């Protein structure tokens, strides 16, 4: 993708997450984008993301659902604002309040994983995202993230701590 991802717009104070932080050199650094009304992210598991030979371990899959969901929540909230500048992207941050994952089939290693999400509910500071992971076009995982917007008081506390 040529446009910036949702995560590219996170303020640096919120860009350290292992799953989606652009400033975490050891993390996954996932990149999520809009594809119509759905969000999409691609991730290629490394050989060390193994569960049993040939298959991805469930913790990685949960992490992908988690971080793609919070990124989608931030982008969905931003998209819903009437005063948004169409040439900008979200810089708000959301955190996981609830994560539910259903493992439907073993997910193979060595193939590009496609993570997709869709906004199920957007109300106040809460966004519910339904998601699924595809391997070779087959849904292997379904999940749901309930994400809440980071309170301004937490942002202020983090900024103070950096000074």
PLM features per residue range, with description:
Residues 1-8, 105-163:
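HotDog/MaoC-like acyl-thioester-processing domains
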Residues 72-114:
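Hydrophobic beta-strand-centered segment that forms part of the acyl-chain substrate-binding groove
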Residues 29-31, 102, 116-118:
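Short, surface-exposed charged micro-motifs
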Residues 40-76:
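A conserved, well-ordered hydrophobic junction motif at loop->secondary-structure transitions
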Residues 43-45, 103, 149:
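Hydrophobic residues in beta-strands and at strand termini
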Residues 67-69, 76-83, 100, 135-136, ...:
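Low-complexity, flexible helical/coil segments
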């Amino acid at each position: 993708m040529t446009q910036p991802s949702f995560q590219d717009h996170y303020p640096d104070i919120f860009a350290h997450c292992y799953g989606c932080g652009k400033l975490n050199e050891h993390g996954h650094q996932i990149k999520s984008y809009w594809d119509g009304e759905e969000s999409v992210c691609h991730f290629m598991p490394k050989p060390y993301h193994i569960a049993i030979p040939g298959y991805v371990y469930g913790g990685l899959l949960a992490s992908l659902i988690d971080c793609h969901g919070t990124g989608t929540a931030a982008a969905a909230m931003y998209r819903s604002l009437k005063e948004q500048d169409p040439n900008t992207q979200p810089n708000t941050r959301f955190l996981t309040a609830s994560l539910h994952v259903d493992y439907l089939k073993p997910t193979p290693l060595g193939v590009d994983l496609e993570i997709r999400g869709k906004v199920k509910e957007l109300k106040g500071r809460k966004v519910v995202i339904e998601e699924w992971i595809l391997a070779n076009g087959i849904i292997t995982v379904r999940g749901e993230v309930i994400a809440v917007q980071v309170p301004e008081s937490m942002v202020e506390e983090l900024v103070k701590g950096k000074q």
